[in-house]
Amino acid sequence: MNKVRTRYAPSPTGYLHIGGARTALFCYLFAKHYNGTFVFRLEDTDVKRNVADGERSQLENLKWLGIIPDESPLNPNEKYGKYRQSEKLERYRQIANELVQKGLAYKSYDTSEELEMQHSEAEKNGIASFRYDKNWLKISEEEKQKRDKAGEYSIRFSMPKDVVYEWDDIVRGKISFDSNDIGDWVIQKSDGYPTYNFAVVVDDFDMEITHVLRGEEHITNTPRQLSIYNALGWKAPEFGHLTVITNMEGKKLSKRDTSLKQFIEDYKNDGYDPHAIFNFLSLLGWTSADNSEVMTHDEIIAKFEPSRLSKSPSKFDIKKMQWFSKQYIKNMDNESIINKLNLNNDEWTNLFVDTFKQSVFALKQLLVEKENYDKPSETAPSLTQADLEVVLSFKNEFQNKDFTISQIQEAIDQVAFKTGKKGKNLFMPIRLATTYIEHGPELAKSIYLFGKDIILKRLSQWN
């Protein structure tokens, strides 16, 4: 295999989405598995839809995930030209004009109103699938020259007849399209900007991209792109089209669905572990040969085989992602967590983090738990008679103990022995009476973290 070069080429029209992150990750894994180069470039020609912060969000969140481009607008290789489409408009115009000069493309002088009329006529004639007819427009040579001089034209590629565009898709196998089903299409708009299907070919050729992994919505774009490669005598990259990501009900993820956070920045701000998301996303449409789940960055790269990319839609299971994050957070060292949360690195905080990191999937949850200790509740819970008996037994044992974690645990064990209670029937009454919280991590530590004075005060009210 020649030197592998893959690319992730988003538009800065929004922030890094789950789907975009998954695509970027698979492109990255493909390149790294074959010791190749992963390129980030920007398709920023849709000026009206561009978000000012879009490029920064994409690059910063990719970096946070551990998906580091070898080349980007911030780290370009001059050999391959510009990494933002807006900076290479002259290059696209040069290639478009070359196609015109070769008779493979032509200037189209239709106004938007005239195109609409052509659409309407086609519908009236019962033509369901509209194809542009370059002979439809009847204007004088004088009018044509006038529009030409004013730059009032687009450039259309002349689709060849009776050609089958076929490729061996990395994910799906053989796919083919008949050129007769595709009309002449615009490669350069009347404002001088290239269309996506044209610019992406020029970019991939200029950057010597060898493999393209992208969403399945691009399958129908591929024959148009192949037609440009053929016309210019350029070698096309290999294509692979990833399946969609759905919610748990099987519906394609929609950015309008507010029931699920869909941007990487949201999970970053909540304090999810970045490698947990890297790990989770890698399994969203791919499985390792040994069916491993929790894997290191390098293990995923080593095990990534494109032949194991799924042909079926992948369900985004937020609970599974939370499980992954939980595995990584509980194995983080306390100091790293304390620094990330900007907390004081003292003995109490270390014990708090060590206790509660076992049961959270996002670091922000630790701050919520810490509120219970920073601002202890004054409202005591209500207890059943059975619960009260357990609490009074604990109160009696506790009064004769030193205030240490081991002694608190010994008091709990003695209550279990004397009352015969165990599990929920033992722990929940004691937890409610001492911490005022129904659920939590290791009970003895949870009690100890409140301090002796608060615990004695709370126990004193139970008689």
Swiss-Prot record:
Signal peptide: none annotated. It holds the Pfam family Anticodon_2. Disulfide bonds: none annotated. ATP binds at residue 255. It is found in: Cytoplasm. Its EC number is 6.1.1.17. InterPro entries: aa-tRNA-synth_I_cd-bd, aa-tRNA-synth_I_codon-bd_sub2, aa-tRNA-synth_I_CS, aa_tRNA-synth_I_cd-bd_sf, Glu-tRNA-ligase_bac/mito, Glu/Gln-tRNA-synth, Glu/Gln-tRNA-synth_Ib_cat-dom, GluQ/Sye. It catalyses: tRNA(Glu) + L-glutamate + ATP = L-glutamyl-tRNA(Glu) + AMP + diphosphate. A motif ('HIGH' region) lies at residues 10-20. Keywords: Aminoacyl-tRNA synthetase, ATP-binding, Cytoplasm, Ligase, Nucleotide-binding, Protein biosynthesis. It comes from the Bacteria. A motif ('KMSKS' region) lies at residues 252-256. GO terms for cellular component: cytosol. One of its GO terms (molecular function) is zinc ion binding. One of its GO terms (biological process) is glutamyl-tRNA aminoacylation. Belongs to the class-I aminoacyl-tRNA synthetase family. Glutamate--tRNA ligase type 1 subfamily. Catalyzes the attachment of glutamate to tRNA(Glu) in a two-step reaction: glutamate is first activated by ATP to form Glu-AMP and then transferred to the acceptor end of tRNA(Glu). HAMAP family: Glu_tRNA_synth_type1 (MF_00022). Monomer. This is Glutamate--tRNA ligase. The gene is gltX.
